[in-house]
Amino acid sequence: MCGIFGISSTKPISNQLIKGLSKLEYRGYDSAGISGHDINSKLVTIKATGPIKNLKHKLSKLKGITTAVSHTRWATHGQPTLKNTHPHLSEYIGIVHNGIIENYLDLKLYLKKKGYVFSSDTDSEVICHLMNYYFNKSADMQSSIISTANSLEGSYAIAAINSHIPHTIYTSCKGSPIILGKGVDANYISSDITPIVDHTKHFIPMDDSEFAEINSTSIKIFNKNKRTIRKPTKVSKINKNQASLMGHRHFMHKEIYEQRTIIQDMTSRFVGKNKILPNIFGHNTDKLLENIEHIHFVACGTSYHASLVAKDWIEQFTKITCTAEVASEYKYKKINVLPKTLFVSISQSGETADTISSLKKALKLSYTNTLAICNVAESTLTRLSGMNFLMNAGPEISAVSYTHLRAH
């Protein structure tokens, strides 16, 4: 999992990019990079291995840039080296990518035959060369990103800039999240809402196979036929102070010390004098859950361990039987769903790829209903699930998940 953050503004943005990437460091922290338009519309790129702070001493190269894309990486294809660090470049094009391109070897062979030279070991580099190839054919960036997306198999969130089209970012996603932020004299793209709320509460989540063209004054969303898609703007309920250190030494320190307050707050909101309050999963959900006899938990990592605890407690105190599965296993298994079974997905971010894939599979099966236990109201998981339980435990920026394990 990697993090993408981009800004198109009327003012210099280099420090904002570093701050935004820091909010995404839980998504990857083995290397980071930024690419933007200089005053002559040429692409200027900086990269560094290791944590995001290693980029800071290179920021002078980005002086004055107002439009750029940035990336923090957790390596999947290729070692965490400088040559494999995003952004990747191809003549006019610079791209950042989150996801896995399953047919990248076929695309790489095709592009090599067209004369393209590869400088990294990543699957992501095929995207920038492919986009450059299509742009050379069409001289139209919208057509180029559409043709590129049509050629890709797998999951992706892409943000791209073009030296021939200054002050503009192009983006698309499939199976990996992209959030668009609407500001004043600036617009934003991000892998999640956390970096955006520092600048604006107004956002638009993109859906799979949508495309967007962003500059400092406008956001245009369109489909593969270039037809404009009109989507409502949402307002985030996240308090930007929740995503700040608030006097703590670092975010791990903050998240350790705020556990007690968050659990007390959750208890006061969801637990009455003698029982859990009704409808905590939404309107009339208490009636929907009355006849549930089985629960199927699916999650990854820390959330999976929380589901094991829930399984033991539920079976100890009720007659409901439970199973708990790792999402990466569930999505490939043959599943026999018993009658009156509730599917429960658990994810702090609501963007865990395997958990989302499992939920999409579950929606095609005969579960009585689906419930997401999540911390982010604006996430893919909550949008897809029939019911939601929002922890409101504050954003996770440290990757250790102390608070969110307890909240789950």
Question: Model-flagged regions — what are they?
Answer:
Residues G28, K333-L338, T380-T382:
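Short glycine-biased active-site loop of nucleotidyltransferases that positions the nucleotide triphosphate
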Residues V126, I196, A324-K333, E351, ...:
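Short acidic loop-to-helix transition motifs that present clustered carboxylates
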Residues W74, S176-P177, G301-S303, Q348-T352, ...:
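Short glycine-rich anion-binding loops that position phosphate/pyrophosphate groups of nucleotides
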Residues P177, Q264, S268-F270, N274-K275, ...:
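Anionic-ligand anchoring segments at beta-strand to alpha-helix junctions in alpha/beta enzyme folds, i.e.
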Residues M1-L245, R249, Q264-N291:
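Conserved short alpha-helical segments that host acidic/polar catalytic motifs at enzyme active sites
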Residues K114, K174, T318, S366, ...:
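Short, structured coil segments at secondary-structure junctions
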Residues T403-H408:
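Conserved small/polar residues in nucleotide/adenosyl-binding loops
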Residues K201-H202, M206-I214, F343, S347-T382, ...:
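Phosphate/diphosphate-binding loops
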